[in-house]
Swiss-Prot record:
It comes from Neosartorya fischeri (strain ATCC 1020 / DSM 3700 / CBS 544.65 / FGSC A1164 / JCM 1740 / NRRL 181 / WB 181). Keywords: Cytoplasm, Endoplasmic reticulum, Heme, Iron, Lipid transport, Membrane, Metal-binding, Microsome, Transport. It catalyses: a 1,2-diacyl-sn-glycero-3-phospho-(1D-myo-inositol)(in) = a 1,2-diacyl-sn-glycero-3-phospho-(1D-myo-inositol)(out). Residues 177-352 form the CRAL-TRIO domain. Gene3D superfamilies: CRAL-TRIO lipid binding domain. Heme binds at residues 202, 222, 256, 258, 292. Its cofactor is heme b. CDD domains: SEC14 (cd00170). This is Phosphatidylinositol transfer protein sfh5. It is a peripheral membrane protein. Residues 1-87, 358-415 are annotated as: Disordered. GO terms for cellular component: cortical endoplasmic reticulum; cytosol; endoplasmic reticulum membrane; plasma membrane.
């Protein structure tokens, strides 16, 4: 009876036969196949005497489940890389140069000793404001990581030494030297988007030597105005990363007005001040300019813009727009036209009435004038002498030299 039971238990043999019907030809063959293909069930069948057929079936089902259990750990291992992918943002995966730039950021911050740019604390690649800052420096250097690293390092060192935020917030500048020369406005679109505009009124220079004589003071005043504008860009509040090859909402518009300015002479003081300004702005404020408009520029000065195209990149010069009549400026911004001052074709008050500027203070020498008025005789003589001497000081110079500033200043913050 014990020898006949395996012959009656046909379920296991049938399973094997289904997989290889051409091989199974006899009962003996089924026995050999069962013994060869399923050695484990035979061992367990020997230990179980009450229901061998049932045990064999159970053993087979248990054996079938074992491979699935063995395959589970590899599946878990394959899921680990998927979980690690979010660690590298998409904008880094698409831009290897930007990823390399971020790898260098800790060393850059360490070597410069400063970790703030335009009000943005420099953190890591998961911080949108930080990413936007690095994108600007990388763009300015056409994707060259080494050059971008060098420029960012210099800019950070400069900010540490100069403290431009303090220049804009807590420093006062001479109204006599800089009053009426620079303004800041913010114009809102219907959708709430803001347009930051800086104005440089070169025709407002009263005395060349007074305004440009102290080069360091002039540069600080110019930086203070720029910092006010940068603050209005609100880069530290960014919640998304700008498209490296797309539009950049963190840029400003600049207007240079040359009304009543002559371009015929080059004063050494102006040349030195503007050259220094160009160096500072090119290094410390890359990719912050959207467009630059030169208004009230004489038609004969077209050579100035032709010269710029020789020395500046196409990416920079394409942002320059000369306009001979300043009253046509507002036409360039149809949706903002009413917010522009009347003198520029809009409906708003003059810049002197509605625009912001840097902190200005009267010179210490100004209050001394009333004390001299007590001695009318002496004062009259002095005033007469002064009035006679003024025509001899060539009043045409103030108009001539600021124009050269206009000629050179456009490149100051061109990028």
């Amino acid at each position: 009876m014990a020898d006949q039971q395996p012959e009656k238990t046909t379920a296991p043999a049938t399973d094997v036969a289904d997989s290889q019907p051409a091989v199974v030809t006899s009962t003996d063959t089924r026995k050999e196949t069962t013994e060869t293909a399923e050695p484990l069930p035979e061992d367990k069948t020997e230990t179980t005497t009450a229901q061998p057929a049932v045990e064999t079936t159970a053993t087979q089902s248990g054996t079938a489940e074992t491979p699935a259990e063995v395959q589970q750990p590899p599946q878990a291992e394959e899921e680990k890389p998927v979980a690690q992918q979010p660690e590298q943002p998409a904008y880094l995966a698409k831009n290897p140069a930007l990823a390399q730039f971020f790898e260098r950021l800790p060393a850059i911050v360490s070597s410069s000793g400063h970790a703030e740019m335009w009000g943005v604390p420099l953190k890591d690649s998961n911080d949108a404001p930080t990413v936007n800052v690095l994108i600007k420096f990388l763009r300015a250097n056409e994707g060259n990581v080494k050059l971008a690293e060098g420029q960012l390092t210099k800019a950070l060192k400069w900010r540490k030494e100069m403290n431009p935020s303090a220049l804009a917030e807590s420093t006062s500048y001479s109204a006599t030297k800089f009053g009426g020369l620079g303004y800041l406005t913010v114009y809102k679109e219907a959708n709430g988007a803001e347009n930051v505009v800086t104005w440089n009124i070169y025709g407002g220079v009263k005395d060349i030597n007074t305004t440009f004589g102290d080069m360091d003071e002039f540069v600080k005043w110019r930086v203070a105005l720029m910092e006010l504008a940068v603050k209005e860009l609100k880069m530290a509040e960014a919640t998304s990363v700008i498209d490296y090859d797309g539009e950049d909402p963190y840029q400003m518009i600049q207007v240079h007005d040359y009304q009543n300015v002559s371009f015929l002479r080059l004063n050494p003081a102006i040349k030195a001040a503007t050259k220094k300004t160009i160096e500072v702005f090119t290094t410390a404020y890359p990719e912050l300019l959207r467009e630059k408009f030169f208004v009230n520029v004489p038609a004969i000065m077209g050579w100035m813009f032709a010269a710029m195209k020789v020395f500046l990149s196409k990416n920079t010069t394409r942002k320059f727009h000369p306009i001979s009549n300043g009253a046509n400026l507002a036409r360039e911004f149809p949706s903002l036209k009413d917010q522009f001052p009347k003198v520029y074709g809009g409906s708003a008050p003059a810049l002197q009435e509605g625009a912001r500027t840097v902190n200005l203070s009267q010179d210490e020498s100004a209050p001394a004038a009333p004390e001299q008025s007590k001695e009318q005789t002496k004062e009259n003589k002095e005033e007469a002498a002064q009035e006679e001497s003024k025509p001899e000081s060539a009043p045409e110079q103030p108009k001539a030299d600021p124009a050269v500033t206009a000629q050179e200043a456009p490149a100051a913050d061109a990028k």
